[in-house]
Swiss-Prot record:
Homotrimer. InterPro entries: MECDP_synthase (IPR003526), MECDP_synthase_CS (IPR020555), MECDP_synthase_sf (IPR036571). This is 2-C-methyl-D-erythritol 2,4-cyclodiphosphate synthase. The keyword Metal-binding applies. It catalyses: 4-CDP-2-C-methyl-D-erythritol 2-phosphate = 2-C-methyl-D-erythritol 2,4-cyclic diphosphate + CMP. The lineage of its organism: Bacteria, Bacillati, Bacillota, Bacilli, Bacillales. Belongs to the IspF family. Binds 1 divalent metal cation per subunit. A divalent metal cation binds at D9, H11, H43. The keyword Glycoprotein does not apply. The gene is ispF. Its cofactor is a divalent metal cation. It comes from Shouchella clausii (strain KSM-K16) (Alkalihalobacillus clausii). GO terms for biological process: isopentenyl diphosphate biosynthetic process, methylerythritol 4-phosphate pathway; terpenoid biosynthetic process. Keywords: Isoprene biosynthesis, Lyase, Metal-binding.
């Protein structure tokens, strides 16, 4: 049996915070605002994984109203969600992600993101795709007010 999950997330850019995407620190004057470390890419993957097994979303498992998750490391949140996937009897087929950001240019960091995500999902890097795009200066992403990401995940029943 296979299961598919989809995730989407947006975070506002703000000064005074580090920019983390896919578990990788990206040098930039602004970072993402959020209750946790606001890693928008890992959040979308977490949502996609939880959705694929019918277990809700990031907010259900790690609510931003709970101080226990204040400044939480999104790598830890994804690892906890991934344990639920494994407990449900599934393994990763593949995950395909897109990050939408006007700046910074993300191409130099894509491979590091793929490696980090592969490690968190206990898979080969060949099963992880991360792409980056701009919105051609349109909308909040184009005005550099925020960064958005989406992910689609394919899970397979473990043998």
């Amino acid at each position: 049996m296979i299961r598919i999950g989809q995730g989407f997330d947006v975070h506002q850019l703000t000064e005074g915070r580090p920019l983390l995407l896919g578990g990788v620190h990206i040098p930039h004057p602004k970072g993402l605002l959020g209750h946790s470390d606001a890693d928008v890419l890992l959040h979308t993957i977490t949502d996609a994984a939880l959705g694929a097994i019918g277990a809700g979303d990031l907010g259900k498992h790690f609510p931003d109203t709970d101080e226990a998750f204040k400044d939480a490391d999104s790598k830890h949140l994804l690892s906890q969600a991934w344990q639920l996937v494994k407990n449900a009897g599934y393994t990763l087929g593949n995950v395909d992600c897109t990050v939408m950001a006007q700046k910074p240019k993300l191409a130099p960091y894509i491979e590091a993101m793929r490696k980090q995500i592969a490690e968190l999902l206990e898979t080969d890097v060949a099963n992880v795709s991360v792409k980056a795009t701009t919105t051609e200066t349109l909308g909040f992403v184009g005005r550099e007010e925020g960064i958005a990401a989406q992910a689609v995940i394919l899970l397979q029943k473990a043998e």
